[in-house]
């Protein structure tokens, strides 16, 4: 990996550590719910409540195609699909997150509604007008070229579609110094 964001977030053996944590709680990690996973996959400000509120305000509905850019291991994507019946594609720069998200999703019965793809938000690997909704939660802060990011999000959003963003927007215009509060290694 040569990208500092991918290097920071790409921790090895993440799935094994998640499985071990569930085993220590006496929980079968092969059969989970989105609520079970929330402590490990909803690490953005506001957690599941913020995701639900964003979805309500954004009027997410059944059978829409949603692109979750920087969606990590897929917590919000699984929640959206579970609660609203939409299909969600998670795009993340970090290969380990994509691998773990793809492994966890069948465990909550959503493998046909949530998919994962490794890729760069500044070069979205999708045709124009592919998604009803483009969605981000605390991922744009990791992307310095905001104008290009927003052009790419707009490009893949269908005419009349929605861009739904939950981001921290204010602060000094300096490079990000890891770890940011929601990405502390534990």
Regions found by a protein language model. Give the residues of each.
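Conserved alpha-helix/loop element of class I SAM-dependent methyltransferases that forms part
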Residues: 27-30, 44-62
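Class I SAM-dependent methyltransferase Rossmann-like catalytic core
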Residues: 35-45
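Class I SAM-dependent methyltransferase SAM/SAH-binding core
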Residues: 65-123
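A short SAM/SAH-binding and catalytic strip from SAM-dependent methyltransferases
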Residues: 132-145
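A short glycine-rich, Lys/Arg-flanked "PGG" loop and its adjoining helix->strand segment in the class I
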Residues: 147-162
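Short, glycine-/aromatic-enriched active-site segment of Class I SAM-dependent methyltransferases
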Residues: 168-186
């Amino acid at each position: 990996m040569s990208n500092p964001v991918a290097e920071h977030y790409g921790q090895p053996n993440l799935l094994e550590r998640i499985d071990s944590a569930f085993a220590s709680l006496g929980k079968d990690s092969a059969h989970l719910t989105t609520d079970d996973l929330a402590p490990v996959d909803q690490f953005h400000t506001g957690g599941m409540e913020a995701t639900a509120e964003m979805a309500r305000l954004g009027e997410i509905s059944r059978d829409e195609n949603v692109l979750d850019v920087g969606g990590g291991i897929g917590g919000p994507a699984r929640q959206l699909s579970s609660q609203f019946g939409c299909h969600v594609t998670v795009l993340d720069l970090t290969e380990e997150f994509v691998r773990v998200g793809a492994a966890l999703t069948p465990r909550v019965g959503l493998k046909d509604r949530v998919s994962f793809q490794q890729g760069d938000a500044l070069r979205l690997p999708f045709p124009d007008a592919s998604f009803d909704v483009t969605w981000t939660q605390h991922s744009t802060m990791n992307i310095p070229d905001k104008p290009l990011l927003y052009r790419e999000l707009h490009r893949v959003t269908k005419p009349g579609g929605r861009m739904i963003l939950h981001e921290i927007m204010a602060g000094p215009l300096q490079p990000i110094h890891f770890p940011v509060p929601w990405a502390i290694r534990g």
